[in-house]
Amino acid sequence: MDAKTPVTLAKVIKVLGRTGSRGGVTQVRVEFLEDASRTIVRNVKGPVRENDILCLMESEREARRLR
């Protein structure tokens, strides 16, 4: 991460489930700290739980829902 790359802070409001071939990715719903009315679904690699703050390098793309 360099100084030129803008990051967006988002708070995990709900853990939706595990995905990936071995369950190594967690699907979460996040709410942006700058705009609390805006929420999206993202895939997160590694340990994550509710109320964690994520630094999103890219904040426009939304993950597909679990089946």
UniProtKB/Swiss-Prot annotation:
Its main location: cytoplasm. InterPro entries: NA-bd_OB-fold (IPR012340), Ribosomal_eS28 (IPR000289), Ribosomal_eS28_CS (IPR028626). PROSITE patterns: RIBOSOMAL_S28E. SUPFAM superfamilies: Nucleic acid-binding proteins. The keyword Cytoplasm applies. Pfam families: Ribosomal_S28e. It is found in: Cytoplasm. Keywords: Cytoplasm, Ribonucleoprotein, Ribosomal protein. GO terms for molecular function: structural constituent of ribosome. One of its GO terms (cellular component) is cytosolic small ribosomal subunit. The keyword Cytoplasm applies. Coiled coil: none annotated. Disulfide bonds: none annotated. It comes from the Eukaryota. Belongs to the eukaryotic ribosomal protein eS28 family. Component of the ribosome, a large ribonucleoprotein complex responsible for the synthesis of proteins in the cell. The small ribosomal subunit (SSU) binds messenger RNAs (mRNAs) and translates the encoded message by selecting cognate aminoacyl-transfer RNA (tRNA) molecules. The large subunit (LSU) contains the ribosomal catalytic site termed the peptidyl transferase center (PTC), which catalyzes the formation of peptide bonds, thereby polymerizing the amino acids delivered by tRNAs into a polypeptide chain. Component of the small ribosomal subunit. Mature ribosomes consist of a small (40S) and a large (60S) subunit. The 40S subunit contains about 32 different proteins and 1 molecule of RNA (18S). The 60S subunit contains 45 different proteins and 3 molecules of RNA (25S, 5.8S and 5S). This is Small ribosomal subunit protein eS28. The lineage of its organism: Eukaryota, Fungi, Dikarya, Ascomycota, Saccharomycotina.
